[in-house]
Regions:
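Metal-dependent nuclease catalytic cores that hydrolyze phosphodiester bonds in DNA/RNA
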Residues: 1-133, 175
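Mg2+/Mn2+-dependent nuclease catalytic core
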Residues: 95-211
Length: 212
């Protein structure tokens, strides 16, 4: 998993969209890791391994004496099974979906120097044969329920995915799903690309303010 972060990262977008000056104020402070962050990183690596294995890629399972627990196995299964079900449903439409695992996406056309890493981008066709991009994000936390509804992190990932690959299936619809197994939360938000682009235009001035 990439560990480089943009100043206007998607994961911190809720903060910089609501308080633009905070980005530069915090720039000099080091990022402090934690046990929870380390566990989350390992769980994401296991998720990546399981999906890549399904895709018949040659991969080695990540190892951790501390974090490789039965619970991690269970919650990563929830994620992998959900993602695989999306891919299989798209295949039923007659298309071969494009699947991008831990994909770096660039949304610098919206937020200066903006980029991030999407856990999963799946591009293909929906149930009606229309172009669709589905963005999935895995959350290991159990303290705060994360809703996909108009989630700025997910919307920025979707914008980056559209900019890079949207033309391949003439994407008309965006779906964004948060998978948070410890809270039994699988939350999905769907919107037309036109709505996503309207939101993107509305946040451009805020992003510039935060960056400067």
């Amino acid at each position: 998993m990439p560990d480089v972060h943009a100043l206007l990262s998607a994961s911190s977008s809720k903060q910089w969209l609501h308080c633009p000056p905070s980005v530069r104020l915090q720039e000099g402070f080091p990022n402090e890791s934690s046990v929870y962050a380390a566990e989350g990183t390992f769980a994401h690596e296991v998720c990546e391994y399981k999906v890549r294995k399904y895709l018949h890629e040659r991969v080695k399972r990540p190892q951790s004496e501390e974090y490789d627990t039965e619970e991690i196995e269970q919650i990563t299964d929830v994620y992998a099974e959900f993602v695989i079900s999306i891919i299989e449903k798209m295949k039923e439409t007659g298309c071969e979906p494009l699947v991008f695992v831990e994909e770096r996406v660039d949304y610098s056309h919206i937020a200066p120097s903006g980029f991030g890493t999407a856990d999963m981008l799946i591009i293909g066709k929906d149930e009606n044969g229309k172009g669709l991009i589905h963005v999935c994000d895995f959350k290991t936390g159990a303290g705060v329920f994360v809703d996909a509804d108009h989630n700025s992190q997910m919307m920025l990932y979707a914008l980056g995915g559209l900019a890079a690959y949207g033309f391949l299936y003439d994407v008309e619809t965006v779906r964004m799903t948060i998978i948070q197994p410890r809270l039994d939360n699988i939350s999905t938000c769907e919107m037309p690309v036109s709505e996503l682009n309207e939101w993107a235009e509305s946040i451009k001035p805020i992003a510039v303010m935060a960056f400067e």
